[in-house]
Amino acid sequence: MPPMERWDFLAMRVRCALYADDPRAIDHLFTMGGYLHEQGDACAWDVARKTAMLLMDTAEDTALPWQWRCQCLDHVARPLGVMQHIGRMSDAPPHLSSEYRRITQALLQRLSRLEIHRESW
């Protein structure tokens, strides 16, 4: 399977909580995203942005198990950190810094509306 298809497949597994009992699924997604960047198949900014949005979308999905939603929410900071680092680099295009601020503001608004309740056992 080509690397980009593999990354899309891993993203689908995370988004649909297909392996909700295996938190390594999120780590595999990060690993494959790094591989795509290293091989020149995708830029780090795009991988980080898509990953952050995927994790936030998953965290907001009330149809998924709460523990999986919490795992995704816990991991959102990682791609945001990558985006912040790229935006602060001296050779980064100026629009990336403002795009980072726009994305983080949008995520903060989404977080303020997010409700993750643990279902009763």
Which residues fall in each region the model found?
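TPR/TPR-like (Sel1-like) alpha-helical repeat modules
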Residues: 42-60, 84, 88-91
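Short N-terminal helix-initiation segments at or just after the protein's N-terminus
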Residues: 18-27, 113-116
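Helix-turn-helix repeat elements of alpha-solenoid scaffolds
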Residues: 1-12, 44-50
